[in-house]
Amino acid sequence: MSYNEFLPSYSIGHDCYKEIPYVTRRYGKTAVVIGGKTAMEKAKPELLAALKGSDLEITDFIWYGGDSNYENIEMLKAMPEVQNADMVFGVGGGRAVDTVKTLCDRIDKPFFTFPTLASNCASCTAISVIYNADGTFKEYAYLKAPALHTFINTKIIAESPEKLFWAGIGDALSKEYEVVFACRDKDMTHTPLLGRVLAEACTEPLVSYGKKALEDCRNNVSSKNIEQIALDIIITTGLVSNFTVHQNNPDPKDDYYYNSSLAHCVYYGASLFPKCEHDHLHGEIVSFGVLCLLTYDEQFEERQRIFEFNRSIGLPCTLGEIALTEEDVPAIAHKAASVVEWTYVPGEPTEEKFIKAILDTDKAGKEFLAKA
C-alpha cells in the first residue's frame, strides 16, 4: 500500500524571521497569525519588522481560544479572516500550535509554525493533542503532514520562562530511551528504522548543552547552547515522532506507535493525582519516568548517568520530588497498562514488573541523593 512521509524544514537563529518572505513566497501574499496571547505579543514586533517592505502582508492576529480542542478549531474555521488568508502562521506553545495544525489540516490551508517556547516538538510534528472542552485529554489527531516550515527564533526562546525550557529538556530526555526500547523486538521497516536511528541523537546534546542552556535562558541570552537544545527539543524529537508513529492507516496491521513508552506511561499514571499533575510539569514527570524505564530494562549504568544529569539541573530522581508516594504506584501502573504505549513494550509487560521498577527507582534515587 502506498503512503506519504512529509518531512519538516526549519530556520533557526535570533534573526531567522527575515527568511519568512523567501520561504513562504510560493504560497500567497497574505497570512493570518493564530496563537497564544503572550506568544503573539512577543513575536509580533519581530514578525512585522521581518515583513516590512516585502510582498507578504499579515492581515490579523487571532487568539487561538486557550486550548487545543475541536470547539476552538471550529470557531477559527468559521472566521472570514482565516478563510480569506492564503496561509496561516501558528505562534506559541504546543496547544496553540496543535490547534493551528489541526485547523489547517481540516481546511487544507498552508501553514507555518513559530514556536516561542522550546518545551516540546509540536511545531514540526504531524500529531496534535486534542482536549475536551473541560480541559481533559480527548485524543490524538493524526494529520496528513507537518508544517511546511518552522521558524525558531532563538532570541524569543531565550526570553521564554526558564521553567518551561527546563521541562522541555526533561521531556526530550525520554525520546532516545523510549524509541530504542519500543522498537527492540519489532520488524523494523524503512520509516520507523530511520526514526530509531535518529532517536539515538537526542540524549547527548541535552547532557552536553543542557545546563549551560538553562543558565543562558535564565539570563535571556541567545547562544549556541540555546540553539542546540532548541534544535534537539523541537526538530530532532519532532522528526523522530513523525517517523515512529503511523496510526492513520485504514489497515490496522500497518499501524505502529514507537514514539514513546514507559517514561510517558509514568506520566499518564501520575496525571491521576492532582497533587502531582497541578504542581509539576509534563517534562519534569517524564524525566523521572526515564529513570523508571532504565530500571525496568536493567540499564543500571545508564540510569546512574541520568541520575547525575537530573540532579545537575534539578530534575527529579525520586517519587517524592513529584509529590507521589509508594502507595500511588499501583494506580500509576494500572493506568499505564491501558495506554497505547503499553502495547508496544518489548516482551510481555506486567503491572507487577512496572510497579517494582518504579519502586526500585525511587529507592535508588533516595540512595543516590543521600550520597550526593
Q: Locations of the language-model features?
A:
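Short glycine/serine/threonine-rich phosphate/pyrophosphate-binding segments
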Residues: 17, 40-44, 70, 95-102, ...
